[in-house]
C-alpha cells in the first residue's frame, strides 16, 4: 500500500511538470488541495527515508578502509612509515554474521600494520557477547602488538545485574578475554615500544568523558607514572571518548602527539562527501569523525567497526583506520 501511494504521488508530480498552462488553469475539479499535496509529499519523504534505512542495513558489514599519512614534528627516521591500524566500537553483541566479521578482520591484516590499536566498546553490555567472536579477533597480529582499552559499554552499566558482585565479575571476565585473544589491555597505564632503535610511548586510559552521563574512570596522570622525563619523540594515547581531547588532553598534556578515540559511531547516519561531512552527532560532539589537529597535536575519531541500536549504517560506514606516520 505504501509503495503504491508513493508511486501514485510520483506519477502525479511528474504529470504536473509536463502539464501545459492550459491544463494547469483548468477547472478546480482536477486540482489537488494543499492538504492532499502536503500529505502525499510527507508520504513520499517518509517512504524515501524508510527505504534509506532499510538499505542502510546492508552496509553494516561494509568496512571502509580510511588511510591517512600523518606528519609528526621531530619524528625520527626510524619511526617514519610506522603503520598503525585503529579499530573501535566493535559491539560484538550486535553481530549476527561471523563470516562478515571475519572478512573485516582479514581486511585489517591485509594492511600489514606494525601496530593494532582498539579504542573501546568491545561489547554492548556483557562479556559473554564476545565469546562467539574471540577466535576471529584472535587473528589480529602485529609486530609491535595489539593493544586495547575500555569504552563506556564495557563496564556493564546499561544492564540490570543480579548483584554488584556479578557486575564486577563481568568486567574481570572481559579483561581476561582481551588477554586470551592476545590483546594487551591498557587501563591507565603505558608501554614503551621500539621500532628500528627508536622508542615511543603508547598510553591507554579507561573511559573518560566530558559528558556527565558517561563514566570518568580514566586517569591520565596515572598512565604517565614511570614515564618520567624521558625524551621520547612520540606519544600516542588511546582514549575512547573524543570529548576527553578538548576537556583535558590538549590543555594539560601538550606532549601527546596523537590521540585515538571512537565512541560516536558517526551516529551511523549522515552524509560524507569529499568536500563535506555531516551527521546529527556533530551537535553533541565537536570532534566526531576523522582527523582533527591543533598545532602539533592530533586527534583521530574512528567511526566504529560495529553498530549499536540501529542495525545498519546509512551514509557513515564502519571503519578500519590506517595511519602512516611521517
Give names to the regions the model predicted.
Residues 1-61:
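Non-catalytic terminal accessory segments
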Residues 33-34, 66, 181:
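Generic detector of short, well-ordered, non-transmembrane alpha-helical segments enriched
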Residues 75-326:
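Soluble catalytic domains of enzymes that build or remodel membrane lipids, polysaccharides, and related
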Residues 62-71:
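Alpha-helical transmembrane signal-anchor/signal-peptide segments
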Amino acid at each position: 500500500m505504501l509503495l503504491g501511494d508513493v508511486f501514485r504521488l510520483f506519477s502525479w508530480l511528474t504529470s504536473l511538470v509536463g502539464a501545459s498552462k492550459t491544463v494547469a488553469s483548468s477547472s478546480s475539479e482536477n486540482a489537488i488541495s494543499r492538504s492532499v499535496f502536503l500529505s502525499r509529499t510527507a508520504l513520499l519523504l517518509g517512504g524515501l527515508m524508510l527505504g534509506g534505512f532499510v538499505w542502510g542495513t546492508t552496509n553494516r558489514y561494509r568496512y571502509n578502509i580510511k588511510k591517512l599519512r600523518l606528519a609528526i614534528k621531530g619524528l625520527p627516521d626510524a619511526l617514519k612509515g610506522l603503520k598503525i591500524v585503529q579499530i573501535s566500537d566493535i559491539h560484538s553483541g550486535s553481530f549476527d554474521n561471523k563470516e562478515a566479521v571475519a572478512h573485516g578482520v582479514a581486511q585489517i591484516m591485509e594492511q600489514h600494520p606494525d601496530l593494532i590499536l582498539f579504542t573501546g566498546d568491545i561489547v554492548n553490555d556483557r562479556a559473554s557477547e564476545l565469546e562467539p567472536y574471540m577466535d576471529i579477533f584472535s587473528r589480529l597480529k602485529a609486530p609491535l602488538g595489539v593493544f586495547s582499552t575500555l569504552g563506556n559499554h564495557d563496564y556493564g552499566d546499561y544492564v540490570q545485574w543480579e548483584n554488584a558482585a556479578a557486575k564486577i565479575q563481568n568486567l574481570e571476565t572481559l579483561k581476561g578475554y582481551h588477554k586470551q585473544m592476545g590483546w594487551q589491555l591498557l587501563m591507565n597505564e603505558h608501554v614503551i615500544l621500539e621500532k628500528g632503535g627508536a622508542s615511543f610511548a603508547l598510553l591507554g586510559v579507561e573511559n573518560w568523558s566530558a559528558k556527565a552521563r558517561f563514566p570518568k574512570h580514566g586517569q591520565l596522570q596515572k598512565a604517565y607514572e614511570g614515564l618520567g622525563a624521558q625524551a621520547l619523540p612520540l606519544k600516542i594515547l588511546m582514549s575512547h571518548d573524543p570529548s576527553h581531547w578538548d576537556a583535558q588532553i590538549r590543555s594539560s598534556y601538550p606532549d601527546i602527539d596523537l590521540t585515538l578515540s571512537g565512541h560516536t559511531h558517526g551516529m551511523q547516519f549522515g552524509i560524507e562527501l569529499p568536500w563535506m561531512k555531516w551527521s546529527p552527532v556533530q551537535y553533541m560532539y565537536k570532534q566526531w569523525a576523522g582527523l582533527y589537529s591543533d598545532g602539533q597535536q592530533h586527534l583521530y575519531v574512528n567511526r566504529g567497526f560495529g553498530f549499536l541500536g540501529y542495525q545498519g549504517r546509512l551514509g557513515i560506514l564502519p571503519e578500519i583506520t590506517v595511519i602512516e606516520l611521517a
